A protein has these predicted regions:
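N-terminal amphipathic alpha-helix/helix-capping segment at the start of soluble metabolic enzymes
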Residues: 1-33
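Short beta-strand/loop segments at the ligand-binding rim of alpha/beta enzyme cores
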Residues: 9-20, 125-131, 143-156, 217-231
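Hydrophobic faces of well-ordered beta-strands that scaffold small-molecule active sites
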Residues: 17-23, 37-41, 92-98, 130-134, ...
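Active-site beta->alpha loop and helix N-cap motifs at the rims of alpha/beta catalytic domains
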Residues: 36, 41-140
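Generic structural signal for well-ordered alpha-helices
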Residues: 76-87, 110-117, 141-144, 165, ...
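Helix-rich catalytic cores of soluble enzyme domains
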Residues: 94, 98-180, 191-201, 206-209
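C-terminal extensions of enzymes
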Residues: 296-365
Length: 365
């Protein structure tokens, strides 16, 4: 936490939502004077840790033990064991993602998630302490629906639209992670909307608040728990603070942005808006959307100039016929189509680099 007597931006954000760490390095997580809730990851973070010297011995041993079972068995066990290094340093869950290369294959997604479940059990990590990230495509979300029924907790990732969020609700998922910025914006700053008041001005804020308001309504109408909104893909501390004001339940934040948040002294008078303290129950005791953000409910800058003003309907069965309706919606929305493809391409790159590392290791053991 911040130094005594001075509240940091990180301290303030933790009052409004659960702060998670989107990074896997155990030394960094331990060194922070803050116990994060969840530790999230993706194929890039797993690949970085797989190549780290601190895991070399474990990697060799695991490759020897599982030789003959294929690269994925080794990769999956290593990913779980590397998460295990952080389990005592966090309050909540560790998260790992199914193969992005199989995002349109229900059975392969199901198989990989079940393999994670088996490896977590072997490592002594219960289902209350992990969650499996599933790409928000029709086939993968159909796998998530089955996993939810089996009691395996899931998160809908690579999520860019209200339609995807509704599909995740229909799959009974624990969390969703709307990407606040598209993945390419982290490296191509020309794609990043550099605004002074992200909650109000960032082009993705309307979609985030529309998801939150839709989930609040569904909870009220059905009494059924809705996925918790774990906002992700922040480039600046200001964007992370916007997640608090919008009413997100958690924010998973990179180590670089977390360091900045921890060093900034909080001054409410210099903030464009402020979130409320987190409620006891995310939906039962949900706070209303701040008045200044209500205009976001009726706009969608990402939809382009020809948007008809209609939000995705909760009456559509997005998972029927292998997820045909959600795939159709993903294809029809230009922002989702592009950003989903970019995210999967990025993570497939990480997957392929890890596969090469495993195969190189197998050649030596």
């Amino acid at each position: 936490m911040g130094s005594t007597g001075t509240q940091s931006w990180l301290d303030k954000l933790e009052e409004q939502l659960n702060v998670d760490v989107d990074w896997m390095a155990p030394e960094w997580i331990k060194a922070m004077p803050f116990k994060f809730h969840d530790q999230t990851s993706n194929q890039l973070w797993v690949d970085i840790q797989l190549g780290d010297d601190s895991n070399k011995e474990l990697f060799e041993q695991t490759s020897k033990e599982l030789k003959g079972q294929g690269w994925l068995a080794i990769y999956t066990r290593m990913a779980v064991l590397m998460c295990k290094k952080n389990i005592d340093s966090i309050q909540g869950r560790v998260l790992l993602q199914t193969l992005p290369s199989k995002a349109y294959d229900t059975q392969a997604t199901l198989d990989h998630a079940r393999l994670y479940d088996k490896e977590f059990a072997r490592a002594g990590i219960s289902r209350e302490r992990f969650c499996i990230k599933i790409p928000s495509t029709g086939p993968a979300l159909n796998a998530a629906k089955i996993l939810s029924a089996e009691g395996i907790p899931t998160l809908g990732t690579a999520l860019f639209s209200l339609a995807q969020a509704i599909a995740c609700s229909q799959a009974g998922m624990l969390y969703i992670s709307p990407y606040y910025n598209e993945t390419r914006a982290h490296d191509e700053l020309s794609l990043w909307p550099d605004v002074s008041d992200p909650a109000l001005e960032h082009p993705n804020s309307p979609r985030v608040v529309q998801i939150l308001e839709t989930y609040k309504r569904l909870y009220k109408e059905t009494g059924k728990e809705q996925p918790l909104v774990k906002n992700a893909s922040f480039i600046t501390p200001q964007e992370a603070m916007a997640a608090g004001e919008m009413g997100c339940h958690s924010a998973t934040i990179s180590h670089t942005v977390l360091e900045k948040l921890s060093k900034l002294p909080y001054d409410a008078s210099k903030q464009p808006g402020e979130g409320l303290p987190k409620p006891v129950h995310a939906y039962k005791n949900a706070d209303p959307l701040p008045e200044r953000l209500k205009k976001l409910l009726s706009i969608d800058p990402l939809a382009g100039p020809n948007w008809d003003g209609k939000l995705a309907s909760t009456d559509v069965d997005y998972l029927a016929n292998g997820g045909a309706e959600i795939d159709k919606a993903n294809e029809a929305d230009k922002a989702t189509k592009t950003r989903l493809a970019d995210a999967l391409t990025l993570f497939i790159g990480g997957e392929e680099r890890s596969k090469a590392k495993v195969e190189a290791m197998l050649a030596t053991v």
